[in-house]
Amino acid sequence: TRWSHRSLVQWKELFSAVRQPLFHETGVLWLARHYGAREQLTVETLQRSGVTFSILDHAQLAASYAQINTENVDFAIFEPHSGVLLARRAVAAVVEDALRQGAEYRTAEIGPIRNAGAADDFKTTAGEIISAEHFVFACGSWLGKVFSEVLASLIFPTRQEVFFFATPPGDARFAAPAMPTWLFQEDQVYGMPDLESRGFKIAFDQHGPIVDPDTQSRFASPEAAEQARSYVARRFPALRNSPIVESRVCQYENTSSGDFLVDRHPEHKNVWLVGGGSGHGFKHGPAMGEYVAGQILGEVPAEPRFSLASKETTQRRAVY
């Protein structure tokens, strides 16, 4: 929570500096069947972190969001200042800003580490030698393939499918500000309002099957599409007959617990392995960058949950 809050401040600073409005303050609505232990911990964490939020009961929720079928939902948290980062364009903005500040950006495939101990350099498959004092590898779902000898059984890349539904012409109920970004806790489903006329987004947060990110099909499956249609019809009745106008297939990249991985390569102490971002690593990017830099420079204590030693070969998801 602290990292998310800190990162949003830095994302906004970047977007202001590059003059690109890549954050939509839609608000985020967290929905749950009832107020239990997990909900209490969430409220306490938000309070400690100074995050602005309000609590809604069933009646308040139904009155505020009549377009949502709130059956069996008796508790909700609304964060008015949260929202949606436009990921692809934000990454491009980071690269452009880094170039302006003197960084180099290259697209290349590296070969294996060529020597024991500290890695002095890496050779790309094109024959270029890249030398540095420290190397950081944040390869997402490909991290387990790039360092298969260490991470093949510790990184779990799963198939995740996303769908966008058309909204009725002239109907603003499914666009911000009438519709916030939302998440149903027990259903493990989340979505976003219609942004930039792309449609109403829905995705399932359950982990899909383990896949190879290089070879998995990028076409959405009929089964997942039908699951999305069924859910939308139940929770958002006005979209019951709306067509799917776009679909995407991507990956989550999890460790056994769902915690991040930030640690040295066990055989090459100047090579850092950074991963386990799941579906939320991007939004934590600024805080993660600060932490990794602090680790390399020896300026911040290591978080035990991020260590390589804490990762197991069997998934026991604890972080969502």
Locate predicted features:
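C-terminal catalytic lobe of FAD-dependent flavoproteins
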Residues: 231-320
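Active-site substrate-recognition segment that forms the wall
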Residues: 13, 19-24, 134, 141-270
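Dinucleotide-binding Rossmann-like beta1-alpha1 core, especially the glycine-rich loop
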Residues: 1-64, 73, 188
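Short loop/edge segments at beta-strand edges and connector loops
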Residues: 57-58, 106-109, 246
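Glycine-rich, N-terminal phosphate-binding loop of Rossmann-like dinucleotide-binding domains
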Residues: 33, 139-140
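Helical element adjacent to the flavin cofactor pocket in flavoenzyme catalytic cores
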Residues: 78-126, 130-134
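Short beta-strand to alpha-helix junction loop
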Residues: 2, 30-38, 77-96, 217-224, ...
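A short, glycine/Asx- and small/polar-enriched loop/turn
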Residues: 38, 67-73, 114-121, 254-258, ...
